[in-house]
Amino acid sequence: QIEAGRRAMTRNVRRGGKTWVRIFPDKPVTLRAAETRMGSGKGNPEYWVAVVKPGRILYEMGGVAENIARKAISIAASKMPIRTQFIISG
């Protein structure tokens, strides 16, 4: 989802500005194989997730007009399973 949002933003901005992804998936999620008996330890890491708490900045853009950035980030936000908000700093 992070990568899908990043791709959508860069495709929308084209060669305008620069995009930064401010989150990184650093928590492994382990899964056991289907129909495995109980016991014998923990399953293997299947994929990685990023835990996002409220107030965390997900993406950052620079060198782009505000209306283009707002449109690009709203497209990226539609790919996220959480409620997001567009903020302007500086």
Curated annotation (Swiss-Prot):
Q: Which GO terms describe its biological process?
A: mitochondrial translation
Q: Where in the cell is it found?
A: Plastid, Chloroplast
Q: Which GO terms describe its cellular component?
A: chloroplast; mitochondrial large ribosomal subunit
Key words, A-Z: Chloroplast, Plastid, Ribonucleoprotein, Ribosomal protein
GO molecular function annotation = rRNA binding; structural constituent of ribosome
Q: Which InterPro entries match?
A: Ribosomal_uL16, Ribosomal_uL16_bact-type, Ribosomal_uL16_CS, Ribosomal_uL16_dom, Ribosomal_uL16_sf
Principal subcellular localisation of the protein: plastid
Domain of life, source organism: Eukaryota
**Which proteins does it associate with, and in what oligomeric form?**
Part of the 50S ribosomal subunit.
Family of the protein in this entry: Belongs to the universal ribosomal protein uL16 family.
Classification via PANTHER family: 50S/60S RIBOSOMAL PROTEIN L16, LARGE RIBOSOMAL SUBUNIT PROTEIN UL16M
What is the protein name for this chain?
Large ribosomal subunit protein uL16c
Q: Report the gene name.
A: rpl16
